[in-house]
């Protein structure tokens, strides 16, 4: 009984503190997604890879980690200034060629991290379960460079975590949990980010609604 009460209490907190999700049309317009860490050691690589595989079934997907090089000049185009014409042209061409582009950064603060946020329609902020919520350089970057893109928190692992504290520190609207290697988790995340998720409505009033949850 105690576990059940705690589960319901957690569920209610998440519902009450979560703003309504964007309409499906808004989410279906998402083409560029930044995957960023909110603390050192966050599993950014695993999340970006899993999300890219899931999105690939919906359209051509590119994942860029900041090491893109000009084959002719040998320059790291992604590391140039955000105002550099060659860099802007390179990323614009990618976004034209691919249905989805994932911008990945492993650093909390850098020119490339800021560019990832500037390019993104949606930001996926990655935290590891079990890590206490903390303000980091990425928290500041999100405030400066997200340019109105919605931020959604992804917690990796099943350990105890306070998602609401992480969300408050980083301005995230929603949070999701995924496990490394769990393909179904990333397919669900891809559906939610792109507005292709299917919801379930419970009817019959409060008591009956909770009864439906019990059946699930």
Where are these regions (language model features)?
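Cyclic-nucleotide recognition modules
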Residues: 1-8
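Alpha-helical scaffold segments in soluble metabolic enzymes
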Residues: 7, 50, 54, 188, ...
């Amino acid at each position: 009984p105690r576990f059940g009460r705690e589960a319901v209490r957690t569920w209610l907190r998440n519902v009450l503190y979560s703003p309504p999700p964007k309409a499906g049309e808004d989410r279906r317009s998402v083409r560029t997604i930044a995957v960023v860490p909110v603390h050192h050691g966050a599993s950014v690589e695993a999340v970006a890879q899993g999300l890219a595989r899931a999105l690939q079934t919906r359209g051509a997907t590119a994942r860029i980690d900041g090491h893109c090089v000009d084959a002719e000049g040998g320059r790291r185009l992604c590391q140039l200034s955000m105002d550099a014409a060659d860099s802007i042209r390179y990323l614009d061409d990618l976004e034209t060629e691919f249905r989805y582009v994932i911008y990945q950064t492993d650093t909390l603060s850098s020119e490339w991290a800021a560019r990832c946020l500037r390019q993104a329609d949606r930001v996926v902020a990655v935290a590891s379960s079990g890590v206490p919520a903390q303000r980091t350089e990425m928290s500041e970057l999100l405030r400066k460079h997200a340019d109105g893109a919605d931020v959604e928190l992804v917690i990796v692992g099943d350990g105890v975590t306070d998602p609401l504290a992480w969300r408050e520190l980083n301005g995230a609207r929603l949070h999701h949990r995924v496990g490394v290697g769990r393909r179904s988790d990333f397919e669900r995340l891809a559906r939610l980010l792109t507005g292709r998720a299917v919801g379930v409505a419970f009817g019959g009033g409060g008591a009956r609604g909770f009864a439906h949850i019990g059946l699930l």
